[in-house]
Amino acid sequence: MTKPLDIIITVNSPGEVSGLLKPVVAALATFAWPYRIFVFIPPCPFASGAESRVVEEIPQVNQVIGAQETVRFILRGRLPAKFTPAGKGIVLFLGGDLTYAAFLAKRLRYPAVAYTEGLTNWARSFARFAMAYPWMVDKGKNPAVKKKTAVIGNIMLDAIKPEYSKEEMKRLMGNEQAPGLLLLPGSRPAHFQYMLAFYVKTVEKIKAQMPTLATAVSISPFVTEEQLRAALSGWGAKEWGLSATYHPAGEHTSTTAGSLKVLGEIKTETGVGIPCFHHQQYALMNWADLALTIPGTNTVELAALGVPLLVSIPLNHPEEIPLEGLAGLVGGIPLLGKALKRRLVPKFQAKIKFTAWPNRLAGEQIVPELIGQIFPDEVAEVAIKMLRDESGLAKAGQRLQKVVGEPGAAQRLIDILEEVVGSTYHEGFTR
């Protein structure tokens, strides 16, 4: 075959780009036929706004199509600029709303495969479904859908490749004898603005009792330095009574981390300094003895590396929490939206037993989750207790690794894509 096959991938949040798209694109190196990769980014209330920029940095991706062009193509059939379909291809859903992937497949007349957490709507539009764990398959009740669903493992595990070992990181960070605390304030703008200030204030409280504690912030590639500065002076900082400033590397920064690239440093009024790092999250996770994080991809990645974590979700201002689907549209209604969200968010939260992936997978609490009207003092108290219990941290780390499973899911997904492509275009394709 001389003409490359189109691989159309839908993905639309920071966690999906880093935890799903990147390992799948890497695994496509073994794909049986020549191909071009087109990433469509549908609309998403959780988008950071930087998805297109980050995806464009992935060398194997031929073209990125943003939300507006995606919707135009689906609704009107208007081709995105520079996008010329090959006539043969496959649509792969990795995140967002299945509706967009289903309509893209229909518009292009390509078969489709979906990797989901149990969702199987638009089932007739998909040749196959792939899921990470058996309990996700059990959520479905349609025998026909179950028959075309495969459990392949968690693709996020294939993304985790620390640049340094824990021992090397301890040496580079200069804390061979002291514990390390990693802050992961998220990548979505609304979350980051609120949680960075919350976690920095929490560190102030912890350092007052554990002055030798080493700390670091992993700044998502989806977050800019401008957003970092804004988060330290915005309403989140005012809410928690935080007085802190950000200093880019080389501008009065006191931290050194060997060959690690330090983005800058956060300095608080009380004298606490926290180094910030970009693009080195797995090395930092491997370094940490404990991580403070919000729910999401991070919880799987930390668990895979055996790093204990403390999840916190302050719902002190539920009107600021982004919501999916109809609830998200309702929340955006002028004047009434925020009042409705103040009522909706606590109700949604009450229905969720666990938010951290390791706890969801285990069906019980392995790592603590602090949710609701919470404050930095409370999180600091729990974190100090965990940090002082070295044997407890070690046991939690071992349990976390067992729960999330083994890597290799990305390659198993590629095998499914090959099966679907082979059965659809068997006359025109040879291995």
Which residues does each predicted region cover?
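Nucleotide-activated sugar donor-binding and catalytic core shared by glycosyltransferases
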Residues: 1-431
